[in-house]
Amino acid sequence: MKIAVLSRNPRLYSTRRLVEAGIERGHEMVVIDTLRAYMNIASHKPQIHYRGKPLEGFDAVIPRIGASVTFYGCAVLRQFEMMGVFPLNESVAIARSRDKLRSLQLLSRRGIGLPVTGFAHSPDDIPDLIQMVNGAPLVIKVLEGTQGIGVVLCETATAAESVIEAFMGLKQDIMVQEYIKEAGGADIRCFVVGDKVIASMKRQAKPGEFRSNLHRGGSASLIKITPEERMTALRAAKVMGLSVAGVDILRSNHGPLVMEVNSSPGLEGIEVTTSKDVAGMIIEYLEKNSGPHMTRTKGKG
């Protein structure tokens, strides 16, 4: 197979591993800088050009689209789909997952466990918003944030009001969530490929920190997930329409709660922690499922 990897940086661990795994299994792997691909949206003959030449003959495409280039990246991926190239994750599902609020709305409609979450526009509604998520302590999240950036833990209602007012004053969209104290600064990353959770790890925040992201100095360890956690991760990925996803789950007193569904989960943390060939499993999924004109929109957006 000829497989494209949409990635800004061929030296990133995840990109390198996917290329290695593909070559090991006998495929031709081509890394394409997402922002250097440009499109000819012609009737009956959609094309993508790259460094002066049309891209042709691809069987599958693996999108590794960073949050900052979501709009353009999804447009390039959509053009691949129009050309009949099989996407590991579809453009519509990636766009859906990048909108944190929409993601939670879709998951809640399907009855998947979530932390109580509030969203408001007017400063007049802040006191009621805080009550809605069971008061302080609570967590405030910027909707566009990634890797734990733009996430604030407010210990008191007064602090929460000040922070929410500040964000609103900056015209920054935020959501407010209940703080799950019993999780103890830890979450579980379940790595979903197809209809299986192929690997999972526990991420623990460093002392004095509540964000467990590895980019924020959190540590990762092996964990055995429960059948309920496994089912929650699979259902969350399915609702989002993602074939490959990193589903972040908190262990609460009332069962597993989904924090986020990541459409471009990093491979380094999960491979190093579990010693599993996750990249190889992703390529294997493409071998089994890809075919010309197999793009079908999944999920219920």
Swiss-Prot record:
Mg(2+) 2 binds at residues 260, 262. It is an enzyme of class 6 (ligase). The keyword Zinc-finger does not apply. ATP binds at residues 141, 178-179, 187, 211-213. Coiled coil: none annotated. Residues 104-287 form the ATP-grasp domain. Its EC number is 6.3.2.-. Pfam families: RimK (PF08443), Rimk_N (PF18030). Disulfide bonds: none annotated. PROSITE patterns: ATP_GRASP. Mn(2+) 1 binds at residues 248, 260. GO terms for biological process: protein modification process; SOS response; translation. Its cofactor is Mg(2+); Mn(2+). Keywords: ATP-binding, Ligase, Magnesium, Manganese, Metal-binding, Nucleotide-binding, Protein biosynthesis. Mg(2+) 1 binds at residues 248, 260. Mn(2+) 2 binds at residues 260, 262. GO terms for cellular component: cytoplasm. Binds 2 magnesium or manganese ions per subunit. GO terms for molecular function: ATP binding; metal ion binding; ribosomal S6-glutamic acid ligase activity. Belongs to the RimK family. This is Probable alpha-L-glutamate ligase. It comes from Pseudomonas syringae pv. tomato (strain ATCC BAA-871 / DC3000). The gene is rimK.
